[in-house]
Amino acid sequence: MRAKLDLFTHLLLEWGSVHNLSGAKNHQDIEHNIQDSLQVLDFIAPFKSCLDIGSGAGFPAIPLSLACSNARFILLEPNAKKVAFLHHVKLALNLNNLEIQRMRIEHVSPQSVLVDLITSRALMNAQNLIALSAPFLREQGHFLFYKGSHLRTEIACADHECHVYGKRVYFYSQRRDFA
């Protein structure tokens, strides 16, 4: 897995220098994002399918898809440059468990996707994200949002749903009524 993460890092630096795909501009920044993406493996339940909303340059989906190679990942990203990059990464890393779609969550038919885990990183307010993505989550599925310290201003959440590592707050919650 390390060799593939190193190749992903190389590709992101190469493409990023031309296309401005991410705020990560060097190996250290990308390694930090990789570790941030994988930190959740310490507390999330096993899953068979994941919908990553607003995949951007591939965090957290690419590192997670490498670590959880038996799970199926669907990446939603509306930006054409980022989608082209994600397709390039998929081919270069031979990620057969990845499906990439160029679209926004608002344009996906709820009948077309049903997953165990929904991930998103720095996309939108947690309450809005739950409202948009809940139709795609299986009954016993989980939301996993990579957020900052402002999470509790976005949504009422129990302490066991908030995992804090440094400045990052991971919101991990089973499907429930968030009203």
Curated annotation (Swiss-Prot):
It comes from the Bacteria. S-adenosyl-L-methionine binds at G54, F59, I105, E106, R121. InterPro entries: rRNA_ssu_MeTfrase_G, SAM-dependent_MTases_sf. GO terms for cellular component: cytosol. It holds the Pfam family GidB. Its main location: cytoplasm. Specifically methylates the N7 position of guanine in position 527 of 16S rRNA. This is Ribosomal RNA small subunit methyltransferase G. It comes from Helicobacter bizzozeronii. The gene is rsmG.
